[in-house]
Amino acid sequence: MKRWLGKSLLLLISLLALLWSADQLFPLPLPQDDQARVVLAEDGTPLWRFADAEGVWRYPVTPEEVAPHYLQALLTYEDRWFYQHPGVNPLALARAGWQNLSGGRVVSGGSTLSMQVARLLDPHSRSVAGKLKQLWRTLQLEWHLSKREILTLYLNRAPFGGTLQGVAAASWAYLGKPPSQLTHAEAALFAVLPQAPSRLRPDRHPQAAQAARDKVLRRLAAFAIWTPTQIGEALDEPVLLAPRQEPRLAPLLARRLNGKDSPALIRTTLDAALQRRLEDLLLGWRARLPEHTSAAILVVEHANMAVRAYLGSVDIHDQRRFGHVDMINAQRSPGSTLKPFLYGMALDAGLIHSESLLQDVPRRYGDYRPGNFAAGFSGPVSASEALASSLNLPAVQLLEAFGPKRFAGELRAAGVPLSLPALAEPNLAIILGGAGSRLEELVGGYRALAQGGKAARIRLQPDAPLLERRLLSPGSAWIIRRILSG
């Protein structure tokens, strides 16, 4: 007896050692970062997607982020004993084998959800060797991962037709909503769709898709998973899915945020509805713009600097208008947009008050002879009128008194740097656009007029901190805002 126990123990240890060695030699091919990304609006709406090397689109989710009745439909139809079996369900395999032999054809399969995940991670042939490989990978899954992790892999890797993988990608592409909002009928359809994603693709084969969905609903009814009312309403609901739609909003922001180390879900502060309206608006204006001219729109909530809309060009695909250039982040001439900052700094420095007289008259500064945008000059004007009318000569006069170098330095300290040629010093021309700046930094500077003189950087993502810097005093910011408000 002792000898038999000893041999049995030795055999068990040898078997475990063999399995451990095989696990080390042939590790489980868990998914690695494949560069598939989805850029999201603040509410989770997909704005843009970056496919992996094979063109596949995924939207990662967890079991808690999908409708509970979808999980009920999935597990009831695919694997009722998912949480009880060790990856392989012997009873299901035996039943499927008997049914297939009795029917002389493949009537049903005995694959568990874990076995399907194993096949998704490591595709195999339908030969005996292929089935053994699938069983081995299934056992590895159960050893290394929890049931929740295996279910999560299925939710994100199951095929849903074409280049769609995962229930969330399918829900957004076909229904335009998150998987947490699936109806009971939609949940039943999505539970069966991965079994034959090409044959059951609802936008191409709605009748086949509905028949498969109804089969799932009948099984749910047989096991009393859903109430008769829920089953009845789901059976009455037609399969009406829109043609596949891919997210196509904020492409230049998506390109900006998509880096090598970016997460699979790139969250932004954008308002998807506002972004869509403004993109439609800008496209409508394209024909009115001069040739080779683009445009940009940046909408920011000044209290927290969250970006609500980001349009870096008219159309990223319009090569004639250099649509690939992000004009929000590109260096461009600021024109007259720096004038309010200069007047505010001059107020703080005691050089002027709002009614101080400035001279709008022709004047030469060495080789520099500025003029107004509109022909003619106004003579003596108040500082308020000069700023409200965006007159050039008074601004140059004021910059000469304040100092170009000092002005550029204070702008830089507040997060609104100016770009100048190498070794060049700030001069009087910078107040009329003779330097480079970025739209996003100008917007950060203008924030000071609404927030007591504090400039701040724009925030593109929810977890970005609010970084404020003093540009003007609260008093001068209030005065400048009042002047610009008319």
Predicted regions and their residues:
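Juxtamembrane regions of bacterial inner-membrane/periplasmic proteins
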Residues: M1-E291, H302-R308, S313, V361
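Flexible glycine/proline-enriched surface loops and loop-helix/loop-strand junctions
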Residues: A53-W57, K133-T138, A196-P202, G259-P263, ...
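Active-site SXXK
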Residues: L74-L75, L220, L278, N304-M305, ...
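Short, well-structured active-site flanking segments
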Residues: Y83-L93, Q165-A168, P228-I231, R321, ...
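Mid-domain, small-residue-enriched loop/turn segments at the edges of structured enzyme/sensor domains
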Residues: L135, R369-N372, G403-Y446
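A penicillin-recognizing enzyme superfamily signal
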Residues: T268-R288, V299-E301, Y310-S313, H317-M327, ...
